């Protein structure tokens, strides 16, 4: 069970106090937020509206707000400045700055992000393609500084099952299917080709 995995993770790091949860409203972060809400009542869901997709971005933020309100979870949002460069790297940097700011605002040193098993496989592969040393092969760290990632051993399939079983309604980001973004290209094109050689390629990448 995902809840058991998250509880073990929290106990492993002896995490107490206010939990900040990076909440895009997608499958992964909605799953994580829902699980955490069953474990702790001291949670703040924080959402950064990139505002790159106009009305779609607005509706995603609205869905996040409504989910948090319905679950009685404290909610905070900001909208990304228009002058931020519209690239994956710039967006990632802006998100992490936002999360650090939220940690200070709510007097917390614990920020949860919902990176999962599949994300880690894709990250390792991306680093191999770009060229990396042994440190890069470690993939996404489950803990670094104030950031904690309790879903790294949970697959995307398990998360989708949790969402379905609990009748949750996550945001479906249309840009996730846009293969001009390198990570989407890896997810939708390269990984499936590698699975023809090794159906367990995600396990292989996670084991590096």
Residue ranges and their predicted role:
Residues 91, 193-208:
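An accessory alpha-helical subdomain
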């Amino acid at each position: 069970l995902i809840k058991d995995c998250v509880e073990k993770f929290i106990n492993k790091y002896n995490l107490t106090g206010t939990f900040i949860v990076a909440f895009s409203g997608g499958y992964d972060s909605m799953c994580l937020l829902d699980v955490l809400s069953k474990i702790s009542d001291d949670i703040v869901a924080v959402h950064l509206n990139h505002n790159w997709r106009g009305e779609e971005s607005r509706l995603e933020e609205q869905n996040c707000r409504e989910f948090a309100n319905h679950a009685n979870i404290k909610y905070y949002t900001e909208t990304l400045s228009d002058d931020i460069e519209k690239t994956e790297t710039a967006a990632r940097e802006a998100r992490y700055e936002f999360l650090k700011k939220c940690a200070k605002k709510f007097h917390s040193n614990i920020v949860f992000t919902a990176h999962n098993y599949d994300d880690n496989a894709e990250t390792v592969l991306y680093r191999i393609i770009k060229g990396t040393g042994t440190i890069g092969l470690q993939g996404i760290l489950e803990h670094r500084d104030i950031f904690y990632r309790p879903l790294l051993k949970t697959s995307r399939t398990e998360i989708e099952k949790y969402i379905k079983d609990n009748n949750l309604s996550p945001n479906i980001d249309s840009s996730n299917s846009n293969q001009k973004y390198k990570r989407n290209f890896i997810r939708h094109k390269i990984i499936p080709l590698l699975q023809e050689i090794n159906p367990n390629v995600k396990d292989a990448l996670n084991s590096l």
